[in-house]
Amino acid sequence: MTVRESAFVNGRWLAGGGVEFESLDPVTQDCLWKGAAASDDVVGQAVQAARQAFTSWGRLDVSRRIDIVKRFAELLEEDKERLADVIGKETSKPLWEARTEVASMVAKVGISIQAFNERTGVSEQDVAAGHAVLKHRPHGVLAVFGPYNFPGHLPNGHIVPALIAGNTIVFKPSELTPWFAEETVRIWAKAGLPDGVLNLVQGARETGVALAANDGIDGLLFTGSSPTGHSLHRQFGGRPEKILALEMGGNNPLIIAPPYDLKGAVHHTLFSAFVSAGQRCTCARRLLVPDTAEGQAFLDELIAAAANLQVGRYDADPQPFMGGVISLRARDQMLAAQNKLAAEGGRILLEMRSLEENASLLSPGVIDVTDVQELPDEEHFGPMLQVLRYRDFDHALELANKTGFGLAAGLISDSRDLYDRFWLEVRAGIVNWNKPLTGASSAAPFGGVGASGNHRPSAYYAADYCAYPVATLEADQAQAPAQLSPGMSL
């Protein structure tokens, strides 16, 4: 495969200038895309192009910006099957799920327009000091870092509101999903986005460090792992003038508490733990069940159902529930994590296994870690669910909050009283009741606390960090007051 011109700067495709890398099909290991990482020089060109485009883009009437964003959504809809196929090939996500990702990208446009008007619109009122006006301005040049698990939907959740607000962008996707990022940028160009408004730099850590360190950016919007987010936070230390929005991972608890519908509880747990092969930041990582005969009966049903989940290629017919994890490296990391927990006292209830020698396909795994003395507070990004048995609901809440993360938490129980207490006491930015933990609405804020984020939730609240408020007192004419301040004469 030939090396592509992988950087998009000021409306032109350029050679990246850095080290060459590939995107591989996680299951077949076929090369899907080959390009070069953006060098420091190309990163600088991209930032400069965004800076030059900012003046005209930011001054363009918001209705014109929205027209272009709406055209982008129309083009996504027209090309949705091909785009879903690209997502499926590059991530191993089954087509049924890849289609929902493209649909989410389309829906994000209308939601972002509504959020812009509601969260960052114009308000006016007469006050004692004069006429008060609140408006919002774009920050300027924003870097957007995207993850691999939702290579379209998640960066789109930053890019769309940032463009509506009048910012220009330098986009650095995950080095594991460069192909879909390229396809997205091509659609933006086709939608009529002016040159320089959206620029693309490909690459891994070195490219990200260079972009984050560039003095020409006014902020950075990040979705990804907690270690990378913490690294960016350290890199931004001493730079309070830069906006930094971090949406990171979680070690999310899901509590099962009687009474509950057994089939409903099993379904929601399976979906929470294993959808996307466990590669959603909101996936349940820790399952808290009562240490009773009823709790054991629930686990027996869960394990039997998990063992029957279908795993396979993204385009298999009939469709599987799960595809593979993102890479062979990710597969090996998950198997190593399972082995480590077992060595530390965990009891494997359903073994996570590699299903093909040179493929990233993993079967679901469930491991009882109740007896692990020093349970690591880590996000294992794959199809492995850890079980903790609790004595009573006080103990369940204690275990749920025994994490430095704070992204998502869920309760499966018919008891409203337990839920009311759970909502008040659990520490998380997303709290679900009798719904899958992975269920979240773009019409609501999305984000967490602690090691899961820095209190700048995305989704509906992305509008808040894509523009800053400007408070104004206005009068048609400067007039001296009827009574001057003490010690003043005119």
Swiss-Prot record:
Recorded hits in CDD domains, A to Z, give:
ALDH_SGSD_AstD
Q: What is the lineage of its organism?
A: Bacteria, Pseudomonadati, Pseudomonadota, Gammaproteobacteria, Oceanospirillales
GO MF term set: succinylglutamate-semialdehyde dehydrogenase activity
* Record InterPro entries: Ald_DH/histidinol_DH, Ald_DH_C, Ald_DH_CS_CYS, Ald_DH_CS_GLU, Ald_DH_N, Aldehyde_DH_dom, SuccinylGlu_semiald_DH_AstD
Question: Enzyme class, one word?
Answer: oxidoreductase
UniProt organism field: Hahella chejuensis (strain KCTC 2396)
Q: What is this protein called?
A: N-succinylglutamate 5-semialdehyde dehydrogenase
Which reaction equation describes what this protein catalyses?
N-succinyl-L-glutamate 5-semialdehyde + NAD(+) + H2O = N-succinyl-L-glutamate + NADH + 2 H(+)
Q: Which UniProt keywords apply?
A: Arginine metabolism, NAD, Oxidoreductase
What the entry lists under Gene3D superfamilies is as follows: Aldehyde Dehydrogenase, Chain A, domain 1 (3.40.605.10), Aldehyde Dehydrogenase, Chain A, domain 2 (3.40.309.10)
Q: What is its EC number?
A: 1.2.1.71
What is this protein's function per UniProt? Catalyzes the NAD-dependent reduction of succinylglutamate semialdehyde into succinylglutamate.
Q: By its UniProt entry, which Pfam families does this protein fall under?
A: Aldedh
The biological processes this protein is annotated with in GO are: arginine catabolic process to glutamate; arginine catabolic process to succinate
Q: Which family does it belong to?
A: Belongs to the aldehyde dehydrogenase family. AstD subfamily.
Q: Which residues form the active site?
A: E247, C281
Residues that span the membrane, as ranges: none
Q: In which pathway does it act?
A: Amino-acid degradation; L-arginine degradation via AST pathway; L-glutamate and succinate from L-arginine: step 4/5
Residues that coordinate or bind NAD(+) = G224, S225, S226, P227, T228, G229
